[in-house]
Amino acid sequence: MHHDPNPFDEGADDNPFSNGGGGGARRGGGGGGGGGGGGGKSQFSFGFGGLGGGSKGGATVDIPLDNMSDSKGKGKELLQWEADLKRREADIRRREEALKSAGVPMEEKNWPPFFPIIHHDIANEIPANAQKLQYLAFASWLGIVLCLFWNFIAVIVCWIRGGDSKLFFLATIYGMLGMPLSYLMWYRPLYRAMRTDSAFSFGWFFLCYMLHIAFCVFAAIAPPVIFRGKSLTGILAAIDTFSDHAIVGIFYFVGFALFCLETLVSIWVLQKVYMYFRGHK
């Protein structure tokens, strides 16, 4: 007698809960794990087998490990850079201590007090018998700084009142070059000469300081050589501008007085330094 197949009977291949299906799931999981080892890449693979068995329904999740290794490498580089920086700082401190122990003076910037840009310590570095003279020379340097600054202000007033714009640029050049050059060319050599008793420094000071006095005399006169002399607040420029604009003329007359005073003080300083040099030698 022929029996029809049971319609409610499921085949072994179609039953997801049969042993074959479980094996398929295990095979799918194993296939997913094996995929992570190929290609030589640093990654972690985790496979999920499909419910229907086999690797068709499997999903593989790859977790790259390169980011972890990169972060560790950067951390090592930062630590190495920090150690190198500390080593350099320690080396600098060791050299400074060695120079101090050897008696080499360490010049720290201390002037002006509100924004130190130069080293200046007459009370501790200049001999007591030369400190008064050094202070006088320092006043002479501050005097030329004041003269050039006032000259800049007066020329700006003249420019506003209708003067040539080139006067402004010339006054700016006088100020920007005259202030630092006067310090480097004659005041600093005199400071070094007083401190170290160097004949060469004294000679350099005398040469440059005479040029400084010549410039002060030229500025006090302001001959009509460049732009009728109005780029400097001398007597001739003051008379010329006063006839046109009284306010501008007053500014120029004040500048003329400052240059005259600076000339007289500079001649006095030159005489005093020369007498000190001759008497000291």
UniProtKB/Swiss-Prot annotation:
Biased composition (Gly residues): 19-49
Cytoplasmic-facing ranges: 1-139, 271-281
GO CC aspect terms: plasma membrane; recycling endosome membrane; trans-Golgi network membrane; transport vesicle membrane
Cell membrane found in the keyword field: yes
Membrane topology: Multi-pass membrane protein
Annotated segments matching region Disordered: 1-49
Coiled-coil spans in chain: 76-102
Record-given protein name: Secretory carrier-associated membrane protein 5
Lineage per the UniProt record: Eukaryota, Viridiplantae, Streptophyta, Embryophyta, Tracheophyta
